[in-house]
């Protein structure tokens, strides 16, 4: 219910129909020799549209889709769960390697490349934080108070660095990336209507227009 409120607000800026352009995703699907690939996007509170689809053979594919504005989409292999996030832009070509591990990537387009670079660095910071937290818990359990205190200080600094890095990244984007991040946060927090409105009003004009 709360997510519907936020999605309704987020979709207000999408009412203007723009000229669709061809967006192309070319690449390889690791471990699957043939099948059908779809590019799907949420275009309403409970509406999902297929932007494009293609058959693939020998694990290789070329998917062409009609996209009229930047949007968050998912590449989905028929018969398999999960998908691969794509910040799709009109008229942009992408290269992709779709796998079940960390080697998977989709490259091309400013939004996609910026977001993937952000996620890669943020994930590396989270790994550091997890390691420091493990050391802190170990020192604490062994009553090594000085070492635990030092680890705790490092942990707090690392968490603050990640928070500031995220804030700086979002501040540099008044576009789909910011809107997508706020939407994701609303989902995780199950924000109420008042909080959803506050989050929406904090978006810039560019993010609201996505």
What does each of the following model-derived ranges do?
Residues 1-27:
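Bacterial Sec-dependent N-terminal signal peptides
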Residues 21-164:
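A non-transmembrane, solvent-exposed segment enriched in polar/low-complexity residues
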Residues 109, 175-176, 206-210:
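Serine-centered coil/turn micro-motif
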Residues 156-173, 191-198:
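Amphipathic alpha-helical coiled-coil segments
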Residues 172-185:
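Amphipathic alpha-helical repeat scaffolds of TPR domains
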Residues 186-190:
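Short coil/turn linking the two alpha-helices of tandem helical-hairpin repeats
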Residues 193-210:
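N-proximal helix/coil linker or "cap" segments that precede and/or mark the start of modular domains
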């Amino acid at each position: 219910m709360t997510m519907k409120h936020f999605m309704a607000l987020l979709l207000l800026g999408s009412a203007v129909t723009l000229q669709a352009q061809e967006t192309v995703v070319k690449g390889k699907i690791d471990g699957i020799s043939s099948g059908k690939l779809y590019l799907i996007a949420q275009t309403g509170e409970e509406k999902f549209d297929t932007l494009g689809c293609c058959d693939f053979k020998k694990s290789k594919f070329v998917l062409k889709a009609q996209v009229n504005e930047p949007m968050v989409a998912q590449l989905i292999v028929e018969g398999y769960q999960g998908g691969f996030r794509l910040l799709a832009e009109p008229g942009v070509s992408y290269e992709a390697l779709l796998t079940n591990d960390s080697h998977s990537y989709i490259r091309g387009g400013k939004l996609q490349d910026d977001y993937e670079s952000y996620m890669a660095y943020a994930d590396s910071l989270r790994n550091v934080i997890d390691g420091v937290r493990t050391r802190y818990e170990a020192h604490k359990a062994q009553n090594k108070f000085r070492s635990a205190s030092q680890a705790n200080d490092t942990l707090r600094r690392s968490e603050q660095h990640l928070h500031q890095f995220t804030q700086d990244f979002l501040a540099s984007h008044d576009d789909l990336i910011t809107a997508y991040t706020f939407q994701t946060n609303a989902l995780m927090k199950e924000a109420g209507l008042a909080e959803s409105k506050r989050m929406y009003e904090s978006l810039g004009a560019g993010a609201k227009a996505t």
